């Protein structure tokens, strides 16, 4: 049967001819409708109100006029005449009358609002859903019942099933009350209950009750909350769904890859797919890994700048590198110190450690190793004050020249030669137009904008989509999207040479979100799931080249769309929803 909306029965108090109170409900008994004349006031009351209003404004004007005259003549205000006393009495009386007539009704409106179920917001029509009345018409034989009530038709979108109190046990209700009162911290539910999903359910219901906001549409079931405990997310109340599309095959270094992309931007996957098609038809792309090293830069302070310089010379002395490396490398069997770069700002010294981290992205690994070195240095430099384990010279999750120049994570360059016929048939443009557009837009335009590492069309689109799909840290899209796109005509101007240089791709295939089921499946699709047993670090390096190849495909397709004047048309076709969201309610 169709679902319809019905308001809760409104309790009505009625009296019979003998004055006894009769209780009934509006669903079963209908009082005679009130006539408009029932709401009108007696004529005498209208006249009284008009008289009081006139009196109020008259005496108020009189008193203000007298007050002004006294100020002008420097007469003391406390000296009053009989007319002024009478005017004051009339003013007070009229105010009392007006407050009694209008104020009581205003106050009563609040008291009625607390008991009238039709006026309070807690009776949300969206939450009061019942099935259509299926009682036989014979139930309407009693003359006191009116069964001609027409029920409104449900016109809202289907309501997503959410957690209701019926799914909560008595123990859950007690815990919810304790969390609301503050006797049980919300963050401790997992440890107290020993069940991560139950903790998320209780925290979610508590949040809805305390905020008065519904979490409809935010899924709770179908997720392994044990897998995120202590490593991915705290205070869980559900999970967000992001669609995953595939682009490819991407022919890179002689192998084909189907690239998973998690995004909500229409046309992005389609554009990347077209770029992959053009690369495939032209014989594929090649990539080179230039560097692989994660960085961390603690900051320490000394009493004088000279002492800071002493430590700088010590750290950069090749004779001391092996000693420092032994202390650094003992933190992990994968961490291997590569270099130390120092910078001084007054009495402050910033030491940028760079090391290989295997298949992990490596931030935790390098941080632990740096802490070991700091502890070791304090033996020889007791006047060293450690300000912080990270001093932003790393630089993590920030656009910084040091990453653009020195690199961070994986530094990759990827290139391809796109044949002339492919440019015309697949990309719908020509080589000369692409070369000119790249020079004016990606190089000159970015320079005019003062861009730092942003000499590209939309590298961050591809990086972020692949990062979310494979369980990387999306915040590291900032420096991982540093990219310069180069295009030039080759083979007598017939073919197009395109390349992307990305100095700081930060990712891993173990740790963090890579172990989640969905993200692990996407890594498995690319053949880089987990750590490589044969060659530690090879899986993460391969993933970095795939990211660069995906960026190459995305740059090629978007630049072609802009050169051919297809950008607006493609986004109007694939990136606009025809759904009227204003008509969807929850």
From Swiss-Prot:
It holds the Pfam family HMG-CoA_red. This is 3-hydroxy-3-methylglutaryl-coenzyme A reductase 3. Glycans are attached at residue 575. The keyword Secreted does not apply. Pathway: Metabolic intermediate biosynthesis; (R)-mevalonate biosynthesis; (R)-mevalonate from acetyl-CoA: step 3/3. It comes from Hevea brasiliensis (Para rubber tree). Belongs to the HMG-CoA reductase family. Catalyzes the synthesis of mevalonate. The specific precursor of all isoprenoid compounds present in plants. It is a multi-pass membrane protein. The active site is at residues 265, 397, 473, 571. Keywords: Endoplasmic reticulum, Glycoprotein, Isoprene biosynthesis, Membrane, Mitochondrion, NADP, Oxidoreductase, Plastid, Transmembrane, Transmembrane helix. Residues 171-586, 172-586 are annotated as: Catalytic. It comes from the Eukaryota. The chain crosses the membrane at residues 36-59, 87-107. It catalyses: (R)-mevalonate + 2 NADP(+) + CoA = (3S)-3-hydroxy-3-methylglutaryl-CoA + 2 NADPH + 2 H(+). Coiled coil: none annotated. The keyword Zinc does not apply. Its EC number is 1.1.1.34. InterPro entries: HMG_CoA_Rdtase (IPR002202), HMG_CoA_Rdtase_cat_sf (IPR023074), HMG_CoA_Rdtase_CS (IPR023076), HMG_CoA_Rdtase_eu_arc (IPR004554), HMG_CoA_Rdtase_N (IPR023282), HMG_CoA_Rdtase_NAD(P)-bd_sf (IPR009023), HMG_CoA_Rdtase_sub-bd_dom_sf (IPR009029). GO terms for biological process: coenzyme A metabolic process; isoprenoid biosynthetic process; sterol biosynthetic process. PANTHER family: 3-HYDROXY-3-METHYLGLUTARYL-COENZYME A REDUCTASE, 3-HYDROXY-3-METHYLGLUTARYL-COENZYME A REDUCTASE 1.
């Amino acid at each position: 049967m169709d679902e319809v909306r019905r308001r809760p029965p409104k309790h009505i108090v009625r009296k019979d001819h003998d004055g006894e109170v009769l209780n009934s409900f509006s669903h079963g008994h209908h009082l005679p409708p009130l006539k408009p004349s029932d709401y009108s006031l007696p004529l005498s009351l209208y006249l009284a109100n008009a008289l009081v209003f006139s009196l109020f404004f008259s005496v108020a004007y009189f008193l203000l006029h007298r007050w002004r005259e006294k100020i002008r003549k420097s007469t003391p205000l406390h000296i009053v005449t009989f007319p002024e006393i009478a005017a004051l009495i009339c003013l007070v009386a009229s105010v009392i009358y007006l407050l009694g007539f209008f104020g009581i009704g205003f106050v009563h409106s609040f008291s009625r609002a607390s008991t009238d179920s039709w006026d309070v917001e807690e009776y949300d029509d969206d939450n009061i859903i019942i099935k259509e009345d299926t009682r036989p018409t014979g139930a309407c034989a009693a003359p006191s019942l009116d069964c001609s009530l027409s029920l409104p038709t449900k016109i809202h979108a289907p309501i997503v099933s959410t957690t209701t109190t019926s799914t909560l046990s008595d123990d859950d209700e007690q815990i919810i009350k304790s969390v609301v009162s503050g006797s049980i911290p919300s963050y401790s539910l997992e440890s107290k209950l020993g069940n991560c999903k139950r903790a998320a359910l209780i925290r979610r219901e508590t949040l809805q009750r305390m905020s008065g906001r519904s979490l409809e549409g935010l899924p709770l079931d179908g997720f392994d909350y044990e897998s995120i405990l202590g490593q991915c997310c705290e205070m869980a109340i559900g999970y967000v769904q992001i669609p995953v599309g595939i682009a490819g095959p991407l022919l890179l270094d002689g192998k084909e890859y189907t690239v998973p992309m998690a995004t909500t931007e229409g046309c992005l996957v389609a554009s990347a797919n077209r770029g992959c098609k053009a690369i495939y038809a032209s014989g594929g792309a090649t990539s080179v890994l230039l560097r692989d090293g994660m960085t961390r830069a603690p900051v320490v302070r000394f009493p004088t700048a000279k002492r800071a310089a002493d430590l700088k010379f010590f750290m950069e002395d090749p004779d001391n590198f092996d000693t420092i490396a032994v202390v650094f490398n003992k933190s992990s069997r994968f961490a291997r110190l590569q270099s130390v770069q120092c910078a001084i700002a007054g009495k402050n010294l910033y030491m940028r450690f760079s090391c290989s981290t295997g298949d992990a992205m490596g931030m935790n690994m390098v941080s632990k190793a740096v802490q070991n070195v700091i502890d070791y240095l304090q033996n020889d430099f007791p006047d060293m004050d450690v300000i912080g384990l990270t001093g932003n010279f790393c630089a993590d999750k920030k656009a910084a020249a040091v990453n653009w120049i020195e690199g961070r994570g994986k530094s990759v360059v990827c290139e391809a030669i796109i044949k002339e016929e492919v440019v015309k048939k697949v990309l719908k443009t020509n080589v000369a137009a692409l070369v000119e557009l790249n020079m004016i837009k990606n190089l000159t335009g970015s320079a005019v904008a003062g861009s730092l590492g942003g000499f590209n069309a939309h590298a961050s689109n591809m990086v972020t989509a692949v990062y979310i799909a494979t369980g990387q840290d999306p915040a590291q899209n900032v420096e991982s999207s540093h990219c310069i796109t180069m295009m030039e005509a080759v083979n007598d101007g017939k073919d197009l040479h395109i390349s992307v240089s990305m100095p700081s791709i930060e990712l891993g295939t173990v740790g963090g979100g890579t172990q989640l089921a969905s993200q692990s499946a996407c890594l498995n699709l690319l053949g880089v799931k987990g750590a490589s047993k044969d060659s530690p670090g090879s899986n993460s390096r391969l993933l970095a080249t795939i990211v660069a190849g995906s960026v190459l495909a995305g740059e090629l397709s978007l630049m072609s769309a802009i050169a051919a004047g297809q950008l607006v048309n493609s986004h109007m076709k694939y990136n606009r929803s025809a759904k009227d969201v204003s008509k969807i309610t929850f």
